[in-house]
């Protein structure tokens, strides 16, 4: 029996793709092997977004290629965004690989493997999976890709060049996948795409995310729905209201604004400016909600006063969750040739300062939850402490809830429990089970 191992890099959209890919391979008689040294195939799902991600992908390819020294039957095959973007360069610079696929649907890749065609990409990427077979994730949450591709053309972003235009799956197809996952015990469905506000623009000729959420909310069973990637420029009142009104949809808004200086936003190609963003957050907070944002430091032309404006804004809005990254100069983007590029050391200093400010804000926000009772999804146990997440916490990027006082009970992973918060940290909470 042929055995395969998967290495997932990059964003959660890759997680969704690889669960489909894994399920398809297993349906063809392949066996998943958790130990890469014992595999016949290693598939590396790469990321090509920014320099740091590209470097990680390349280093990972070399790391796994080295395993071939002790396993002559091993084939190492990179796939995904980096390979779509730099297909010919990778072929030339890493001859040790045994195959290379661009951005293709999992179904296409499996067909190529079955036919012995190990090097293939399309000029127009296949960003959506169209298969009902998928593996069940080891965790109690699952990423479901509702669409992919982007037409925003932000000045700093290369993604449209290798992901293409927005494409959406049908509501019926997504509903069927979510029903299947819930029937298998998945307790949190996380909807992902390059920009979820674009969902339905191509196939329904409108923003169809509210219709999708209304449909998914009617699926039987106890589970959460979390919506990621809401571009602020087209985050409409209808979308906000649909998140607020649907009981199973968490009041968690992932809205990456990138910056707040009107000058920098205009240079980035972002349409909503400072005052409009403030109004947007006010609309979201009409109902108790957690807002997560992502900010960029070091964009060309970012003066000290622009950065200070950003810091002051973070202090004013007090985001429940926040991430940041340093501007990366990427080929085939408008920002690649912009003047006034920022020194790398200054970029790092600004990022550190920004995250230090957010750390204190988060600490203060977490303290306010002491005494409150939250619903928590139990996920694991570490050193006699149960670990779970609340509506505040997307997996891997946000915090956790630690449950230390649970009496003599043995709690079940994947269950929802009520937890009274008794303590807090910078990003995490701790509490005890409500009897």
UniProtKB/Swiss-Prot annotation:
<keyword id="KW-0479">Metal-binding</keyword>
<feature type="binding site">
    <location>
        <position position="11"/>
    </location>
    <ligand>
        <name>[4Fe-4S] cluster 1</name>
    </ligand>
</feature>
<dbReference type="InterPro" id="IPR020612">
    <property type="entry name" value="Methylthiotransferase_CS"/>
</dbReference>
<keyword id="KW-0411">Iron-sulfur</keyword>
<dbReference type="InterPro" id="IPR007197">
    <property type="entry name" value="rSAM"/>
</dbReference>
<dbReference type="GO" id="GO:0046872">
    <property type="term" value="F:metal ion binding"/>
</dbReference>
<feature type="binding site">
    <location>
        <position position="81"/>
    </location>
    <ligand>
        <name>[4Fe-4S] cluster 1</name>
    </ligand>
</feature>
<dbReference type="GO" id="GO:0006400">
    <property type="term" value="P:tRNA modification"/>
</dbReference>
<comment type="similarity">
    <text>Belongs to the methylthiotransferase family. RimO subfamily.</text>
</comment>
<dbReference type="GO" id="GO:0103039">
    <property type="term" value="F:protein methylthiotransferase activity"/>
</dbReference>
<feature type="binding site">
    <location>
        <position position="150"/>
    </location>
    <ligand>
        <name>[4Fe-4S] cluster 2</name>
    </ligand>
</feature>
<dbReference type="InterPro" id="IPR012340">
    <property type="entry name" value="NA-bd_OB-fold"/>
</dbReference>
<dbReference type="GO" id="GO:0051539">
    <property type="term" value="F:4 iron, 4 sulfur cluster binding"/>
</dbReference>
<feature type="binding site">
    <location>
        <position position="157"/>
    </location>
    <ligand>
        <name>[4Fe-4S] cluster 2</name>
    </ligand>
</feature>
<dbReference type="InterPro" id="IPR005840">
    <property type="entry name" value="Ribosomal_uS12_MeSTrfase_RimO"/>
</dbReference>
<dbReference type="InterPro" id="IPR006638">
    <property type="entry name" value="Elp3/MiaA/NifB-like_rSAM"/>
</dbReference>
<keyword id="KW-0808">Transferase</keyword>
<dbReference type="InterPro" id="IPR005839">
    <property type="entry name" value="Methylthiotransferase"/>
</dbReference>
<dbReference type="Pfam" id="PF18693">
    <property type="entry name" value="TRAM_2"/>
</dbReference>
<keyword id="KW-0004">4Fe-4S</keyword>
<keyword id="KW-0949">S-adenosyl-L-methionine</keyword>
<feature type="domain" description="MTTase N-terminal">
    <location>
        <begin position="2"/>
        <end position="118"/>
    </location>
</feature>
<dbReference type="GO" id="GO:0035599">
    <property type="term" value="F:aspartic acid methylthiotransferase activity"/>
</dbReference>
<keyword id="KW-0408">Iron</keyword>
<feature type="domain" description="TRAM">
    <location>
        <begin position="367"/>
        <end position="435"/>
    </location>
</feature>
<feature type="binding site">
    <location>
        <position position="154"/>
    </location>
    <ligand>
        <name>[4Fe-4S] cluster 2</name>
    </ligand>
</feature>
<dbReference type="InterPro" id="IPR023404">
    <property type="entry name" value="rSAM_horseshoe"/>
</dbReference>
<dbReference type="InterPro" id="IPR038135">
    <property type="entry name" value="Methylthiotransferase_N_sf"/>
</dbReference>
<comment type="function">
    <text>Catalyzes the methylthiolation of an aspartic acid residue of ribosomal protein uS12.</text>
</comment>
<feature type="binding site">
    <location>
        <position position="47"/>
    </location>
    <ligand>
        <name>[4Fe-4S] cluster 1</name>
    </ligand>
</feature>
<dbReference type="InterPro" id="IPR002792">
    <property type="entry name" value="TRAM_dom"/>
</dbReference>
<protein>
    <recommendedName>
        <fullName>Ribosomal protein uS12 methylthiotransferase RimO</fullName>
        <ecNumber>2.8.4.4</ecNumber>
    </recommendedName>
</protein>
<dbReference type="Pfam" id="PF04055">
    <property type="entry name" value="Radical_SAM"/>
</dbReference>
<dbReference type="Pfam" id="PF00919">
    <property type="entry name" value="UPF0004"/>
</dbReference>
<dbReference type="InterPro" id="IPR013848">
    <property type="entry name" value="Methylthiotransferase_N"/>
</dbReference>
<dbReference type="GO" id="GO:0005829">
    <property type="term" value="C:cytosol"/>
</dbReference>
<feature type="domain" description="Radical SAM core">
    <location>
        <begin position="136"/>
        <end position="364"/>
    </location>
</feature>
<keyword id="KW-0963">Cytoplasm</keyword>
């Amino acid at each position: 029996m042929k055995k395969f191992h998967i290495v997932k890099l990059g964003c959660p959209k890759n997680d969704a793709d690889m669960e489909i890919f894994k399920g398809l391979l297993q349906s063809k008689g392949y066996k998943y092997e958790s130990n890469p040294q014992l595999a016949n195939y290693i598939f590396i799902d790469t990321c090509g977004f920014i320099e740091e991600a590209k470097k990680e992908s390349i280093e990972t390819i070399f790391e796994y290629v080295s395993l071939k020294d002790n396993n002559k039957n091993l084939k190492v095959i990179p796939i995904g965004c980096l390979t779509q973007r730099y297909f010919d360069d990778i072929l030339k610079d890493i001859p040790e690989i045994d195959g290379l696929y661009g951005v293709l649907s999992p179904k296409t890749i499996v067909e190529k493997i079955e036919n012995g065609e190990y090097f293939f990409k399309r000029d127009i990427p296949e960003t959506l999976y169209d298969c009902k077979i998928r593996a069940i994730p080891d965790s109690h949450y699952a990423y479901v890709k509702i669409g992919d591709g982007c037409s925003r053309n932000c000045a700093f972003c290369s993604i449209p060049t290798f992901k293409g235009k927005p494409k959406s799956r049908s509501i019926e197809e997504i509903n069927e996948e979510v029903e299947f996952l819930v029937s298998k015990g998945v307790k949190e469905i996380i909807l992902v795409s390059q920009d979820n506000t674009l969902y339905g623009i191509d196939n329904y000729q409108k923003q169809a995310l509210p219709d999708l959420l209304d449909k998914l909310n009617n699926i039987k069973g106890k589970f959460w729905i979390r919506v990621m990637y809401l571009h602020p420029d087209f985050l409409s009142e209808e979308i906000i209201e649909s998140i607020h009104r649907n009981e199973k949809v968490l009041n968690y808004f992932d809205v990456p604004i990138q910056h707040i200086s009107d000058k920098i936003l205009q240079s980035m190609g972002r349409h909503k400016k400072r005052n409009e963003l403030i109004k947007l957050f006010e609309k979201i907070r009409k109902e108790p909600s957690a807002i997560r944002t992502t900010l960029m430091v070091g964009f060309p032309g970012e003066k000290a006063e622009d950065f200070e404006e950003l810091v002051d804004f973070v202090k004013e809005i007090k985001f429940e969750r926040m991430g940041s990254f340093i501007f990366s100069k990427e080929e085939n983007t408008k920002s690649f040739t912009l003047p006034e590029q920022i020194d790398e050391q200054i970029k790092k200093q600004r990022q550190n300062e920004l995250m230090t400010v957010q750390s204190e804000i988060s600490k203060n926000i977490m303290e306010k939850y002491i005494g409150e009772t939250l619903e928590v999804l139990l996920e694991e146990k570490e050193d006699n402490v149960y670990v779970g997440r609340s509506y505040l916490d997307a997996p891997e990027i946000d915090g956790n809830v630690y449950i230390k006082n649970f009496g003599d009970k043995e709690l079940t992973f994947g269950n929802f429990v009520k937890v009274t918060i008794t303590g807090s940290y910078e990003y995490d909470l701790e509490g005890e089970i409500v009897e």
